[in-house]
């Protein structure tokens, strides 16, 4: 059954932009329209959420308690793990509550709040890999000046700038969504995101929609291009390295980051920059893509970054054994 009419039924109450009341509620489509699958999804997503939070928290604690990892690369990794925890916690707990209570509702104010925080933390998951790529570029292409360029002050500035910029961008896009008129209470997704809200908009505010599309494209493509340029230069520098051992060591510091970037940006570009229809199959594909970048990628990040990194694995083992290193050692 297509969703064009059944899934987006027009509501008798046109929701004019900026005039929505605090009593209005959206109905989320959820993870599946099959009731018999809800219990399976609840257990699966609960497991993934617990592992995601525990894994990323372990990364943060391991880096924070081991002075051997107090370097720019691990500072950015700890920041990314924090963003992953916050981003996942913005969407998954509400989805789990809705499954458990068999309720699909979310208040209008709650929807806007979820949208704002998801955009803020989600954009951090886009901006931080760009700073990490820049860090790897400096480490490999300008090794002699690395500590001078990537000073503690500059690292703190880059992360602070990312948080500030993502907050402002999220606030702008949330405000533009607030101004749109909505003609359906049913959102095609399991959380409040730009795509589902744009699909139920019936306003002709083309300027708002164009600004939203422009900002969304800029947030995704500019960091992606910076990452691409950084790694083109990194690969070029590595290939010019005189020794095979040096090339392998340089590649080993970048390959895990490339896996995360490819997985995350592939699904984000599919979700935000490739238009989709309101058909049943399209909604399911959009939901699957959303699961990938909101749940699966944050789940995999700790494993991808730690499995290929001996220092990270050693720090995690020391943390689990209670042997932390707060002082400069060895």
UniProtKB/Swiss-Prot annotation:
InterPro entries referenced in this protein's UniProt entry, alphabetically: GPCR_Rhodpsn, GPCR_Rhodpsn_7TM, Olfact_rcpt
Sorted UniProt keywords: Cell membrane, Disulfide bond, G-protein coupled receptor, Glycoprotein, Membrane, Olfaction, Receptor, Sensory transduction, Transducer, Transmembrane, Transmembrane helix
GO terms, biological process: signal transduction
Disulfide bonds: 111-192
GO cellular component: plasma membrane
Location of the protein in the cell: Cell membrane
Major localization listed first in the record, in broad terms: membrane
Glycosylation (residues): 19
Topological domain ranges for the Cytoplasmic compartment: 61-71, 133-137, 231-257, 308-330
Residue ranges of the TM segments: 40-60, 72-92, 112-132, 138-158, 210-230, 258-278, 287-307
PROSITE patterns, per the entry: G_PROTEIN_RECEP_F1_2 (PS50262)
Signal sequence extent: none
Membrane topology according to the record: Multi-pass membrane protein
GO molecular function: G protein-coupled receptor activity; olfactory receptor activity
Chain's role: Odorant receptor.
Family: Belongs to the G-protein coupled receptor 1 family.
Name of the molecule in the record: Olfactory receptor 1P1
Organism: Homo sapiens
């Amino acid at each position: 059954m297509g969703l064009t009419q059944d899934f987006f039924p027009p509501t008798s109450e046109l929701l004019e932009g900026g005039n929505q009341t605090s009593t209005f509620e959206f109905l989320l489509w959820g993870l599946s329209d099959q009731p018999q699958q809800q219990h399976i999804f609840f257990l699966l997503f609960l497991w993934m959420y617990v592992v995601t939070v525990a894994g990323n928290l372990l990364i943060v604690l391991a880096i924070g308690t081991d002075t051997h990892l107090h370097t720019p690369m691990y500072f950015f990794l700890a920041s990314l793990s924090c963003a992953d925890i916050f981003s996942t916690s913005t969407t998954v707990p509400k989805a789990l509550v809705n499954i458990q209570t068999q309720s699909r509702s979310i208040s209008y104010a709650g929807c806007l709040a979820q949208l704002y925080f998801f955009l803020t933390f989600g954009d951090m998951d886009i901006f931080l890999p760009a700073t990490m790529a820049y860090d790897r570029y400096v480490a490999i292409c300008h090794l002699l000046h690395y500590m001078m360029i990537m000073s503690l002050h500059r690292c703190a500035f880059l992360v602070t700038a990312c948080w500030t910029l993502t907050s402002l961008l999220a606030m702008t896009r949330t405000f533009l969504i607030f101004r749109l008129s909505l003609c359906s209470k049913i959102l095609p997704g399991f959380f409040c995101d730009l795509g589902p809200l744009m699909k139920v908009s019936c306003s002709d505010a083309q300027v708002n929609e164009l600004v939203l599309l422009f900002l969304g494209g800029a947030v995704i493509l500019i960091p992606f291009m910076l990452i691409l340029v950084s790694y083109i230069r990194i690969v070029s520098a590595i290939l010019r390295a005189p020794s095979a051992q040096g090339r392998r060591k340089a590649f080993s510091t970048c390959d895990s980051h490339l896996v995360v970037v490819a997985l995350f940006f592939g699904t984000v570009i599919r979700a935000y920059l490739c238009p989709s229809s309101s058909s049943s199959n399209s909604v399911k594909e959009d939901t699957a893509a959303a699961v990938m970048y909101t749940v699966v990628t944050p789940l995999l990040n700790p494993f991808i970054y730690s499995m290929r990194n001996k220092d990270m694995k050693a720090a995690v083992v020391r943390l689990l054994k209670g042997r932390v290193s707060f002082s400069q050692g060895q």
